[in-house]
Amino acid sequence: MPTIQQLIRKPRQPKIKRSKSQHMEGCPQKRGVCTRVYTTTPKKPNSAMRKVAKVRLTNGYEVISYIPGESHNLQEHSVVLIRGGRVKDLPGVRYHILRGVLDTQGVKDRRQRRSKYGAKRPK
């Protein structure tokens, strides 16, 4: 426990809150170009082939982002828009690709939560 004199000399420093998506630089979304599109397996209790892409952002950073929804049309050099939000069972994946924006197509035959997957309203 510091004395009052010590606190006068050197006051307490507030804790610095670090962003969980630092490469976004405070932006809600960022544009980037896919450098590699591949599948990877999740952590221990889960089992799947999760679709991810390595994306080079406009600010120069290279991040791994998750491709949500069933099937996608992404390949190398596709221009995508990413948002923050990690995938809990994929280490190092801290971003999501937005579907239905730029080169990414929306999910076909999606009926519920369509706005999350860039799907148009079914007729």
From Swiss-Prot:
Q: Mind telling me which GO cellular component terms the entry cites?
A: small ribosomal subunit
Query: Which spans does this entry mark as compositional bias, Basic residues?
Result: 9-21, 110-123
**GO terms of molecular function:** rRNA binding; structural constituent of ribosome; tRNA binding
The regions listed as transmembrane in this protein's record are none
Which Cys pairs are S-S linked? none
As recorded in UniProt, coiled-coil segments are none
> What PROSITE patterns has UniProt attached to this entry?
RIBOSOMAL_S12
For the modification 3-methylthioaspartic acid, the affected residues are D89
Classification via HAMAP family: Ribosomal_uS12_B (MF_00403_B)
Similarity comment: family membership: Belongs to the universal ribosomal protein uS12 family.
Record note on quaternary structure: Part of the 30S ribosomal subunit. Contacts proteins S8 and S17. May interact with IF1 in the 30S initiation complex.
Question: Briefly, what is this protein's role?
Answer: With S4 and S5 plays an important role in translational accuracy. Interacts with and stabilizes bases of the 16S rRNA that are involved in tRNA selection in the A site and with the mRNA backbone. Located at the interface of the 30S and 50S subunits, it traverses the body of the 30S subunit contacting proteins on the other side and probably holding the rRNA structure together. The combined cluster of proteins S8, S12 and S17 appears to hold together the shoulder and platform of the 30S subunit.
The name on file for this protein is: Small ribosomal subunit protein uS12
Originating gene: rpsL
